[in-house]
Structures are given as C-alpha cells and as structure tokens.
Amino acid sequence: MKLIWLNHWFSTAYNIIRLIRDSDPGYTVIGTNENEESPIRAVCDEWYREPKLKGREYADFCLDFCREHGVDVFMPRREMAAVSREMDRFEALGVRVMAEKYPYVELFGRKDLAYAAFREKGIGRVPDFYMVTDTGKFLEAYEALSERYGNVCFKFVRDEGGKSYRLIDNRKRGYASLFKKQTTRISLEEALDALKEKEPFSPVMVMPYLPGDEVSVDCLMTGSGLIAIPRVKDATRIEKVRYDDEIMDTCARFFEAFPLEMPCNIQFKYLDGIPYVLEVNTRMSGGVQMSCAAAGVNIPGVAVAKLLGIDMEWKCDRTERSVTHVEIPVVL
C-alpha cells in the first residue's frame, strides 16, 4: 500500500484523485488544505487542515508531515518552488515528490525568463512583450504595442492562475456592457491609477492581446514517449481536443530542450491563425481530467506510477473530439 499526499490544491484536484484511484485502488490518499470544507476532502482517506506558512517554513512543515505520516508520494501545488528547493531532503526521507527540480520551477515561474529561453532555443513563437516596474514605462509599452497590435493586456510576472491578468479596454461602458463580464477588463486610466498606488511595483509583463483560441496541452514524458493532449478552450464549457501539427511539434521540441520529468501544462493562444506559446506550468492543469477523458489516458495515474518506478502502459486515442463537464453535488 502506497500513501500519496496532496497539499493545498485547487478544487478540481478532486478529479485528479479519482483518476489516481482508478489507476490503482490500493493507494491511500491524504489531503490537506487551509479550507476545512474543500471538496477534495470527499475523495481522501485522511484529511488535515494546513497551517498558514510560506517559503522555507512551509517546506519544513511538509518534511515533518511526510515523516510523521509515512508519505511515499508527495504531490505539491502550494509553495511548489519552496518544496522543490528542498528536494534532496525529501529524497533522503524516501519521499518521491511530483515536482521538477528547482531551476525549472524558477525558470517557468518567470514568464520573461521563459520567453527568453524559448527564443534562444528556437521553440515555437512567443509574443512581443515589455517588462515594466513603473507607470512611465507601462505607458510607453502600451503605446508601442497598441499601435502595432491594437488591443493590449498585462499581468504580474509572479502570478498563478492568471489572477492579475487584465485586458485594457478604453471603450465607454454603456448599456450593452451590463450583459458582459467585466472582471478582466480595465481602462488605461484605471490601470495607471491602480499601479501608481505602489510604484515602483512588482514586475509587470505588458503584451499584445491574442484574440484567437486558447489551447492547453497536458503533457507527461514517459518511458514509452511523450503524452501531449491539446485542449482548445473558449468561453463555453465545451472544449475540443485537436492535434494541431505546429503545436504538437512545438511541444516535442520543448521536451528535447527541457526534459521535464513530471506532468506539466503548456499553454498557447492564436493570433491570425498562428499559435504563440503563452506559458508553461510545472504542474498538472485544473482541467487535466478533460484531456484524460477525451484521449483515454490517465495522466495522474501514469505519473504516480512513474515516481514509484513503474512504467505503466498507456495508449493515446488521437481522435479529435469534444469534451465537457457538469457540476455534481459533493457532500462534505
């Protein structure tokens, strides 16, 4: 019996745990979270509340937790960088950690560094961008990009899940705007006013808005080759698994240059029919279960087996198909 621990994950890890159980019902799963009523609790064998710690202190907590509970596989999301810094200490305990070595976590946690690496190694296409820390440079970047591309967006370099992402929209808000979600839209004036409150501010990446389809590719390198399942996302709940040759080639070249061992997610967005690399997340995506369902591949299960030294057989059904999800009640 192997014991698997998932720390503070987003709620869709509910599906990741179910996939792990599907691959081997003998696994025991521990979940921890700051939120006592996280839906993940419903699919865990054991459940504990996490302390509110950061950085090295949090990594120390994780080491102690692994030691006390006899954890075999640790799947971190919270403070992944801090955990990966201490990878040697986890390995000394005999704990397999589903995280990349720290240099990769740091590289792909910084979009500016990642874009520079992609350009240096000729991996796909990346958008033009400016890095700014004051409103003067922000305005210069906006003017240069808007003249060339039209619409401009920005986000903080240190961000997860796109929480700071904003699209600059200077159109007057009228009656029609009441029927549209405005949470990611902000005028240039509003953006400048907000950024002035903490100037110089944390690095912000300013780039053209790419209006085409967003493609999320769930990936895992295995002993049998690369699993790469691209999901085309739009504003609806219906996603399409579509194997674009350029995207698949870019993913293959990415793994040749950066041999990541753990599950990751590579995101693209289209502009004028051309896919641009947006970012690489060194963890499973929140929608990995959609890819698994469409392609018939259990990425979480294969990844756990890989950490345990098992080369699990898999076969990817590359039929292009639509996939969606529905809300289900979860009693906590």
Give the location of each predicted region.
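Active-site nucleotide/adenylate-binding loops and adjacent lid/helix of ATP-dependent enzymes
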Residues: 105-203, 223
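ATP-dependent carboxylate activation and anion-phosphoryl transfer catalytic cores
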Residues: 7, 69, 237-249, 253-332
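ATP-binding N-terminal substructure of ATP-dependent carboxylate-amine bond-forming enzymes
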Residues: 1-101
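Residue-level detector of structured alpha->beta connecting loops
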Residues: 70, 94, 149-150, 259
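Short, charged, surface-exposed secondary-structure boundary motifs
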Residues: 40-42, 58-60, 106-112, 162-163, ...
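Phosphate-binding site of ATP-dependent enzymes
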Residues: 178-254, 258, 269-270, 274-276
